[in-house]
């Protein structure tokens, strides 16, 4: 019965319409494997389906892979349209094509992996079970590092496995998210060989390797690769819930400061983190009295405060997207700063200013020409802890966080996800923070403007999370 059904499906997939429809539907289902749905088990099945469909049409394998991931990335990253059209007001005449532009570029990397895979000889077991997972992992690494102008690791297979009950997440602490990506691709490949291989010996071998991959992940999940040091410390992540359209309105500056001041006064946590650009003015332009009031409020409560704020460079010619600590007279006499290193192209710097200047005017985007901070910046000293900060989507670059994390005892992300409204972007970024916490074996404090503000454990699990679109303070002990 199974063989007859399999044969009928094989004939059906040879009809171009049904083949293309199957590719599109499977690709469109990939967002379900990621946050906020966390159906991690889906991704090996979906990727395995792509492998089998690609094998059915070897002459069109590269095109099939490209179209699959064009649909997949467009589905996963539809929040690009949310940011440009719904929040920034860009007309759909421009917003829709631009939404598909990045997926169209990103899909070139999977297509290249399948193009190389097609050229490999040898047995099917070798090509599917060994070569393809290796090529896929290299393509994902290249996509993170070598996208023209910037890297972009969102949507990597490995992130789909950063979930509480996923066994494959166990590979993250030993070799990072790329190891999880390899394990996911390998599991998918060997599942294909298990289901679609003749001979019981070959199927038994495939079953053993599937069990080995899953079993190794389960074992690694039980291991502790870091140890707690020192005493527990209380932390707080502040969520202001400031609408993006009002954030840089000068008439809203004082109400914004008052809101954050009231929230800071509520907490007695030792470490308090505010979101990216929580203070909307340049640091040097803020009235000194305002900064003093925040520092004094934190000091009265036994807190040390880190705030997201734009700041001019020392020469005053450029500006930074920064997190600064507000000094107090007892514990933190000097101001410390972390400046964002990975800037968002077209959002925080202008790769092609002659072409993109009209676009910025249409989208009414403030602060779109930041200067990069340096690489491997030192952690900030707060309440006896060394806190390695990253800003916005920087927590998607795990390789860049290794050096700062080695010097740190805590990780912290300060973000403003109001650009993406209620889309899945905030949840996908939270999943990346979970990956970084798991890789580095450290707690992650996430302070965002509207969500998802959360505390993540060294095991990559969400300890506590604040409701989205509500102003408040999320407290925990780490």
Positions of the model-derived regions?
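Membrane-embedded alpha-helical bundles of multi-pass enzymes
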Residues: 2-222, 422, 433, 448-459, ...
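Residue-level signal for pocket-adjacent positions within structured domains
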Residues: 75, 142, 147, 152, ...
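Short glycine/proline- and acidic residue-enriched helix-loop micro-motifs
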Residues: 96-101, 242-248, 362-363
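Generic structural signal for well-ordered alpha-helices
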Residues: 113, 260-264, 377
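Short acidic/polar capping segments at secondary-structure boundaries
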Residues: 136, 141, 177, 242-243, ...
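Membrane-interface segments at or immediately adjacent to transmembrane helices
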Residues: 162-166, 212-296
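Solvent-exposed soluble domains appended to multi-pass membrane proteins
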Residues: 255-258, 276-478
């Amino acid at each position: 019965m199974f063989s007859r059904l399999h044969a009928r499906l094989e004939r059906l997939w040879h009809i171009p319409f049904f083949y293309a429809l199957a590719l599109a539907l499977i690709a469109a289902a990939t967002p379900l494997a990621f946050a906020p749905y966390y159906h991690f088990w889906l991704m090996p099945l979906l990727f395995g389906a792509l492998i089998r469909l690609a094998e059915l049409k070897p002459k069109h394998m590269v095109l099939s892979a490209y179209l699959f991931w064009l649909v997949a990335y467009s589905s996963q990253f539809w929040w690009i349209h949310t940011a440009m059209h719904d929040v920034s007001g860009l007309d759909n005449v421009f917003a829709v094509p631009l939404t598909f532009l990045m997926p169209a570029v990103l899909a070139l990397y999977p297509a290249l992996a399948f193009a190389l895979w097609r050229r490999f000889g040898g047995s099917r077991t070798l090509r599917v079970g060994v070569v393809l997972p290796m090529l896929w992992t290299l393509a994902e690494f290249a996509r993170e590092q070598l996208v023209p102008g910037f890297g972009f690791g969102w949507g990597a297979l490995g992130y789909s496995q950063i979930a509480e009950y996923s066994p494959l997440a166990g590979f993250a602490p030993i070799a990072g998210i790329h190891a999880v990506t390899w394990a996911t691709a390998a599991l998918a490949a060997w599942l294909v060989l298990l289901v679609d291989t003749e001979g019981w010996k070959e199927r038994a071998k495939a079953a053993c390797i599937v069990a080995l991959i899953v079993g190794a992940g389960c074992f690694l999940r039980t291991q502790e690769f870091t140890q707690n040091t020192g005493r527990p410390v209380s932390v707080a992540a502040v969520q202001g819930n400031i609408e993006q359209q009002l954030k840089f309105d000068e008439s809203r500056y004082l109400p914004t400061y008052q809101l954050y001041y009231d929230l800071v006064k509520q907490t007695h946590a030792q470490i308090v983190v505010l979101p990216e650009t929580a203070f909307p003015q340049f640091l040097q332009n803020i009235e000194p009295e305002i900064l003093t009031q925040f520092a004094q409020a934190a000091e009265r409560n036994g807190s040390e405060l880190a705030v997201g704020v734009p700041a001019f460079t020392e020469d005053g010619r450029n500006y930074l997207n920064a997190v600064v600590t507000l000094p107090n007279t007892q514990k933190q006499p000097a101001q410390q700063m972390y400046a964002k290193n990975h800037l968002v192209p077209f959002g925080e710097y202008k790769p092609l200013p002659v072409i993109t200047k009209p676009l910025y005017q249409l989208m009414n985007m403030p602060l779109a020409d930041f200067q990069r901070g340096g690489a491997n910046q030192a952690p900030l000293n707060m309440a006896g802890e060394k806190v390695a900060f990253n800003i916005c989507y920087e927590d998607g670059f795990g390789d860049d966080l290794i050096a700062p994390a080695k010097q740190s005892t805590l990780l912290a992300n300060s973000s403003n996800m109001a650009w993406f409204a209620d889309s899945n972007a905030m949840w996908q970024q939270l999943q990346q923070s979970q990956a970084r916490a798991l890789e580095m074996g450290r707690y992650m404090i996430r302070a965002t403007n509207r969500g998802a503000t959360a505390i993540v454990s060294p095991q990559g699990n969400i300890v506590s999370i604040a409701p989205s679109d509500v102003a408040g303070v999320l407290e925990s002990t780490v």
